[in-house]
């Protein structure tokens, strides 16, 4: 009944991944991001992650597998997803939703820390404000974006962009693969000492 639709969806997902893989710059960006994060951890820094909707879930997934575990048992790494409901609702109510991430970055972000901002469009205003706050704090910035990078293009120390212009779910599928690879590489870097 839906076999052709299922095949089409999986083929489109495979094609999106193949297109991402063809650009060697993406491979280098993932490596640079992992080393940047590991260097921050080694120096006593932490990572703050943020995004909206599915990207928010990805930000939480990233932090959870750093503080908990990925594939192997190892010490936890300092990672915080900006996801505290009381903070999000307070700032949304008192200041506006565009400040929910930046207020948190201003409160706990420090020089030497890293912000991971995730937006499939690259146009999420609250993530952009978080990037601005991170810069003001002396933090490094990594972004996971899609399409043409949107307004976030060029705002990060390392941008990992999925140049897919269809639905956001295809971009998110690559983002979660990148997140898992980042964690694997961070573990390898941290094991070096």
Curated annotation (Swiss-Prot):
InterPro entries: GmhA/DiaA, Phosphoheptose_Isoase, SIS_dom, SIS_dom_sf, SIS_GmhA/DiaA_subfam. GO terms for molecular function: carbohydrate derivative binding; D-sedoheptulose 7-phosphate isomerase activity; zinc ion binding. Binds 1 zinc ion per subunit. SUPFAM superfamilies: SIS domain. One of its GO terms (cellular component) is cytoplasm. Keywords: Carbohydrate metabolism, Cytoplasm, Isomerase, Metal-binding, Zinc. Zn(2+) binds at residues 61, 65, 172, 180. CDD domains: SIS_GmhA (cd05006). It holds the Pfam family SIS_2. Its EC number is 5.3.1.28. Belongs to the SIS family. GmhA subfamily. PANTHER family: PHOSPHOHEPTOSE ISOMERASE, SEDOHEPTULOSE 7-PHOSPHATE ISOMERASE / DNAA INITIATOR-ASSOCIATING FACTOR FOR REPLICATION INITIATION. The reaction produces a racemic mixture of D-glycero-alpha-D-manno-heptose 7-phosphate and D-glycero-beta-D-manno-heptose 7-phosphate. Homotetramer. This is Phosphoheptose isomerase. It comes from Klebsiella pneumoniae subsp. pneumoniae (strain ATCC 700721 / MGH 78578). The gene is gmhA.
């Amino acid at each position: 009944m839906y076999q052709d639709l299922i095949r089409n969806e999986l083929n489109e997902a495979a094609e999106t991944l193949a297109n991402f893989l063809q650009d060697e710059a993406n491979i280098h960006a993932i490596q640079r991001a992992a080393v940047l994060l590991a260097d921050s951890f080694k120096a006593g820094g932490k990572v703050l992650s943020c995004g909206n909707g599915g990207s928010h879930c990805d930000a939480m997934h990233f932090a959870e597998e750093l503080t908990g575990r990925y594939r192997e048992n190892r010490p936890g790494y300092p990672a915080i997803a900006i996801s505290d409901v009381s903070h999000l609702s307070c700032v949304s109510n008192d200041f506006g939703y565009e400040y929910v991430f930046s207020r948190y970055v201003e409160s706990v972000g420090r020089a030497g820390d890293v912000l991971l901002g995730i937006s499939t469009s690259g146009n999420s205003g609250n993530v952009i404000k978080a990037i601005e706050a991170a810069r003001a704090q002396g933090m490094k910035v990594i972004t996971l974006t899609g399409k043409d990078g949107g307004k976030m293009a060029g705002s990060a120390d390392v941008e990992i962009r999925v140049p897919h212009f269809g639905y956001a779910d295809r971009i998110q599928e690559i983002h979660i693969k990148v997140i898992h690879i980042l964690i694997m590489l961070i573990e390898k870097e941290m094991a070096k000492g």
